[in-house]
Amino acid sequence: MVGLSAATLQGAPVVTQDIDLWFENLGDPKFRSALKEIGGFFVPPFGANPPQIGGEGLDLFDVVVHLHGLEPFRKEYCRSKKIRVGNVILHVLPLDRIVKSKRALGRKKDEAVLPVLLDACRAISGGKKRRRAKLLRELGR
């Protein structure tokens, strides 16, 4: 998962209308099988239209095949955060990588949300530093 939906799962106070899912290989039989299992289907790209997922209740999912400013899928996947949502573990693009991609893309709508994402990065980073310092104090270091 990438984009603002991924940022929200990491604590960023943002809203979005869709869930962006980044796929390495849309031709993978597992991708098609998973879609079929949930009653969905794949709509390949045509002209200026990007690839899409179709099916009842699936219109809020957007297919992403490339993220500007980032490493290839496999490298970014290795950096992903695992976040539990209900009974499912999701691989989520880390907040700092979302920021990097939005900066590289440079769309007005991305630039508008960057200050909020950067504040969230600082808050999350600061929280980790405080927890680490507290743990070190408790250990007497």
Language model regions located:
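Compositionally biased terminal segments of proteins
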Residues: 1-141
